[in-house]
From Swiss-Prot:
Cellular component terms (Gene Ontology): membrane
Applied uses, from the record: Eupenifeldin is a bistropolone-humulene meroterpenoid first discovered as an antitumor and anti-leukemia agent. This metabolite also shows anthelmintic activity against the parasitic worm Hemonchus contortus, anti-malarial activity as well as antifungal activity.
Highest taxon in the source lineage: Eukaryota
Subcellular location(s) per record: Membrane
Primary localization: membrane
Keyword vocabulary terms for this entry: Membrane, Transmembrane, Transmembrane helix, Transport
Protein purpose: MFS-type transporter; part of the gene cluster that mediates the biosynthesis of eupenifeldin, a bistropolone meroterpenoid that acts as an antitumor agent.
Record-annotated membrane-spanning stretches: 68-88, 111-131, 136-156, 165-185, 196-216, 227-247, 263-283
Traits of the deletion mutant: Does not abolish the production of eupenifeldin.
Keyword Cell division: no
Species in which this protein is naturally found: Phoma sp
Protein name: MFS-type transporter eupM
Length: 283
């Protein structure tokens, strides 16, 4: 009888200390069981504490790899690609208009700085947006970036000088797009595993679609309603579309389960394979 009860599991709210043996029980002939004091049993530690100590890979091990919520993230990312890289791909229309001298008189090389700074800000913002995302700033980045893009277009509609356009389109819109870029490429791997290639491909096609739609809209409106109202229309289009990711996109992996890093992490510059990769990408 005692042997039969010796294998009885401890209550679910306790686990055995690895330094001790399982509890044994003494029973009499009538089948009464008198357990020994459970001195060597300790309470289960908090689940969140246990999970936070797990390797990062284990947190991503249970991606749903599909489902309505997962594909809504793809839709949201598609919209973000449309309004970031898609808008960036249409800068040639802006440059052609600026070179016409209607708004200001500057050389082509000077005008090219607007698009170059916009592209630089979009990618350089990853230095700050990445750690903010890891600290749970997903929604903050999405909302801030969306407001910045819309505000940038509205400010651009008021510009009459080169330096004003440089600030509104190059810096403001560029930084705002950088706030959107990091979340949209970071969220999909938390929802997909085997279908991550398909999901990323669908989402990134938004940049190509934006590069087709934006130039058509701009060419149709620029010489009919003027530069100011054309950029305002772009702002209204962005406002309507960017409400979609704000509403449907959500974090699946909680910030407490992520690996935190400094806001500006300079340790990456000690990773020589990564540095070589970055240099090769630049070339």
């Amino acid at each position: 009888m005692s042997n039969q009860h010796s294998s009885t599991a401890a209550p679910s709210s306790y686990i055995l200390d690895s330094a001790n043996q399982p509890t044994s029980f003494d029973g009499n002939e009538q089948g009464d069981v008198n357990p020994k004091p459970l001195d060597h049993i300790r309470p289960v530690c908090n689940l969140e504490t246990q999970m936070s100590n797990l390797p990062t890979d284990s947190v991503y091990a249970s991606q749903p790899d599909g489902g309505l919520v997962a594909w809504l993230q793809v839709l949201g990312a598609w919209v973000l690609f449309f309004n970031t890289w898609g808008a960036m791909n249409s800068f040639g229309v802006f440059q052609t208009y600026y070179e016409s001298g209607v708004l200001f008189d500057r050389s082509s090389s000077d005008i090219a700085w607007i698009g170059s700074i916009q592209t630089f800000c979009l990618q350089a913002m990853g230095l700050v947006a990445g750690p903010l995302y890891d600290r749970g700033g997903f929604k903050i980045l999405i909302v801030t970036g969306s407001v910045g893009v819309v505000s940038g277009y509205m400010m651009l509609s008021l510009c009459e000088e080169f330096w004003q356009v440089l600030l509104a389109q190059g810096f403001l819109i560029g930084i705002a797009e950088g706030c959107l870029f990091t979340p949209m490429i970071s969220i999909l791997p938390t929802y997909f595993s085997t279908k991550i290639g398909l999901a990323t491909g669908i989402a990134s096609s938004g940049s190509s679609m934006g590069g087709v739609v934006y130039p058509i809209v701009m060419k149709s409106l620029m010489y009919n309603i003027g530069f100011a109202w054309t950029t305002r229309v772009l702002g209204f289009i962005s406002l309507g579309m960017l409400l979609i990711p704000i509403i449907v996109m959500r974090e699946r992996v909680k910030p407490a389960l992520r690996v935190h890093r400094d806001l500006i992490d300079l340790s990456v510059f000690t990773d020589w394979p990564f540095i070589v990769f970055v240099i090769a990408t630049m070339i």
